[in-house]
Regions:
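Substrate-binding and catalytic surfaces of secreted/luminal carbohydrate-active proteins
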Residues: 1-192
Length: 192
């Protein structure tokens, strides 16, 4: 981007896609944002699962990603068909949102990852943007917040511990106490 900017051609690139194949820190996205705040950052092609996966997805958004694309969306249940390719070395079914029913190909099983991603896809609407909030931490509870175009605020929290985590929602001089059960994810929505 720096080289394109030097010659006045930065408009050739409107954004950068990040993939997590090498486990680089999500903070690399913030470094790019800090140098090019008008440049879109999009996180694509990665699979996160379980409550620990929610923490990673939150980190992508904390570091300026405008999206998160789950990969792989659907696989077959046939163990001879899944995980084909040189980079797939798992000896079990890879993480996926949906699994085809082997007896009825028009039907599928919904996995826990489907519900993990739906905290975002159901409540964070197109055009929403991330807003500042106390991020918490992985040892207690972690949070990311968005403002939808209709004025609703969405807070998505993850509790990876074995105990209930209490917290206080504070917004525009109003507050409400809430909690996240052990080993769970919660979505909290309110209107401005």
């Amino acid at each position: 981007l720096k080289e394109l900017k030097k010659i006045g051609k930065e408009y050739y690139v409107s954004g950068t896609a990040f993939h997590n194949y090498t486990n680089y820190p999500a903070s690399y996205m913030s470094q790019l944002y800090n140098n090019h705040p008008d440049h879109e950052i999009i996180f694509t092609e990665h699979s996160e699962w379980g409550i620990s996966g929610m923490y990673n997805i939150q980190k992508y958004f904390w570091n300026w990603s405008r999206s998160y694309m789950y990969w792989v969306t659907m696989t077959t249940y046939d163990l001879d068909e899944y995980n084909q390719g040189p980079y797939n070395t798992l000896s079990e079914l890879s993480p996926t949102l949906l699994i085809e029913n082997p007896d009825e190909p028009d039907k599928f099983y919904v996995t826990p990852e489907y519900y993990l991603l739906s905290h975002f896809s159901k409540f964070v609407r197109p055009g929403a943007y991330r807003i500042s909030c106390d991020k918490g931490n992985i040892e207690e509870a972690s949070f990311v917040a968005f403002r939808n175009c209709d004025g609703t605020i969405v807070l998505i929290g993850a509790n990876q511990t074995n105990s209930l985590k209490n917290f206080t929602l504070e917004y525009q001089n109003k507050s409400s106490n809430s909690s996240i059960p052990p080993n769970s994810i919660g979505t909290y929505i309110w209107k401005e």
